[in-house]
Amino acid sequence: MKLKTFLIVGCLGGLFTLSSCTAPTNVKDYSAYVNPFIGTGGHGHTFPGAVVPHGMIQPSPDTRIDGWDACSGYYYADSTINGFSHTHVSGTGCCDYGDVLLMPTVGKQQYRTTDPQSQRLAYASSFSHKNEIAEPGYYSVFLDTYQVKAEISSTKRGAIHRYTFPENTESGFIIDLDYSLQRQTNSEMEIEVISDTEICGHKKTTYWAFDQYINFYAKSLE
């Protein structure tokens, strides 16, 4: 297997460190009772991605693009994933966001579907809920089309992606700035290649929120 890890930061200037500590004994873990899939069906309009409370970035899978049940980008009855975008609303009656879509792929892919009304992008992957995990701060799914395991976590201002690809395959990623939920208006899109392992970019969107500017930086930790 081949591992590739990405760090995507929504706002530069933050710093975080890791340190060791001793956990208190006899503390009940209430997070074990949390089910992030609650509200992802019916008209709940929630998403299962890994999010820090009040975090500025919300990495989560998108299974559809348009319609009332696409407000959060994820609908439990769906069986395909278009990719993992980094801005979402939860539990709202109006849709927005779905910015900076990242999708791992194997082999050469078509960029766009020929049907502009399709809920599925040309490079989408099928998946099964039996191979999907959502916990507080962690999301994982197996992408059947590419045989890739995707794992996502987040910090207050960044997202951490880890992908496990099949051995001896032509693996890669699609970063789609023109994608957005409800096909909102995207403009001023740009990606800059900083190095072999770093990119940055920006875009401007208009839908529920007018003149929204998105800036991002991504680095491969492979």
Regions found by a protein language model. Name each.
Residues I8-F16:
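Hydrophobic helical h-region of N-terminal Sec-dependent signal peptides
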Residues L18-S20:
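C-terminal motif of bacterial Sec signal peptides marking the signal peptidase cleavage site
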Residues P24-E222:
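Accessory carbohydrate-recognition regions in carbohydrate-active enzymes
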Residues M1-I8:
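Bacterial N-terminal signal peptides that target proteins for export
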